[in-house]
Amino acid sequence: MTSERMTPELAQRLSLAEQHDWFRRATSRRALLRGGLVGAGTLAAGPALLGGTASASTTASATASASASASTSASSGPALLPASDIPSGSSVVPFGRHIAYGADPTTQMAVSWQVPTAVKNPFIRVGTSPWDLGERIEAEVRALTTLRTDVVSIDNVDPSASSTIEQYYLHATLKNLKPGETYYYSVGHNGFDRPKPSFATSVKSFTTAPHGREPFTFTAFGDQGVTYDAVATENLVAAQQPAFHLVAGDICYAEASGSGLITDPYDPRIWDAYFAQIAPVAAEIPWQVGVGNHEMEAWYSPDGYGGQFSRFAFPTPNTTYFAFSYGNVAFISLDGNDVCYEMPANRGFTADAQTAWLEKQLAGVRTAGIDFVVVYFHYCAYSTCVNNGSEGGVREQWVPLFDKYGVDLVISGHNHIYERTDPIRSGAATSAAPIGATVDPATQGTTYVVAGGAGENLHKFSAADSYEGGVDNISGISSYINSAGGTKVDETVSWSRVRYTGYCILRIDSKPASRGGTSTLTVRGLKEDGGEIDRIVLTRRAG
């Protein structure tokens, strides 16, 4: 694809922000769209909920793809379609529900969904009983417009005769909830209101994080896509009954090449399919997404994330990196595009602000009650996969901080395989950690896991697989590091302990101990049929 005849060669020479500026200048010359493109709407706070206040987020974050002049104000509400063009609400069925924690998982939950066309007065109902969901709480509309001329249909189906593709994302961030409480909810709009559990597909539930130190399970993967195998890994996630799920980037592959170029193949309708695919799981299990290279979409905003800020309710609004805590574990999600040499479209876009924020988080994270620190992001600090190797930008900017502050576990994707390292410090393995080993991160270093086998086409290793039931220990594996200027620096490594070419997820169980005892974090790799391919136990003295 070329956008207004931008050549691929020109796109490769421009940063993502420069491409977006070029695109905005080009499209501003077009006569477009019902008097201007829709940006995003805002909301008012909802009524009191169970002794607190449940309110919807008021951040307007969707960016129109050609003109920001038509974004709506708080006083006027979302400007969607003329009333005469809005179909009957009863015929418009919400789909693609997914939830995520707010800034405080003990008291906040964001509920997001989609409608196929504009609706009037979208809302959520929430209560502690499926039979009593309470009053309506107004939801925020974030409308996203994509020019038909900027779409290369990935499945070769003409999206429509219209000049644009319109997508309507709805969000409500519930606040002042009670810790450790199960809530029930339904979503709707004028003409569509199904608040009773007799509508089995309409009423869903979620549970806020508890106060204190209780055992819990979470899951993780990266590089999912919209495939049969992606459905299988989602079902495997659901079978673990996790408190929440981490996604290490490359979510649905609507942006097909992942280069962050405005000439890349792109079909936003893939997002519709993705949200419909994950809804049976993500409507009740918080889906904590990080971004990868396939989330850089140059059409909506200078940083490429306008589309993501429309689709997802990030814990920190309009920011692709964030932190949260659950029980005795602190979690940090990073945007690897900011430091990446391999896919440089967004390299340096935060001007080192993210790395400074990371150090501040790590310096203060081990407060009373936090035993383990888990960091997740897309690119691999350490991997021997031949497709993408290791990312030098991560090693240069973030790994020294992981060493300095004693990060326990790092989870990545990007390479579509499973791989686990021995514990690493200062770029080298400190000791062997075979399957079933116990690792003390305080003395041995950080364990790195690549869990990128969530559903997209699988990648390959140069060495043989080695996993539970098929161990093949090999030393001296040839690999490479992506470095400055698109170069690849060869290296021979001994830290690759477990390698598995197949679809998989991570299951991680936290078992806190009383103060002075030994807390454990059991890390297990599970293949698509649920069988175990890897297991180690990380230990820390409980604070």
Predicted regions and their residues:
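Histidine-centered active-site/metal-ligand motif
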Residues: L170, N293-H294, H378, H414-H416
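Residue-level detector of secondary-structure transition/capping positions
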Residues: A40-G41, G191
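Divalent metal-dependent phosphoesterase catalytic cores across multiple superfamilies
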Residues: G77-V291, E295-T320, A351-A353, E359-A363, ...
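N-terminal twin-arginine translocation
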Residues: D21, R25-R34, T42-S76
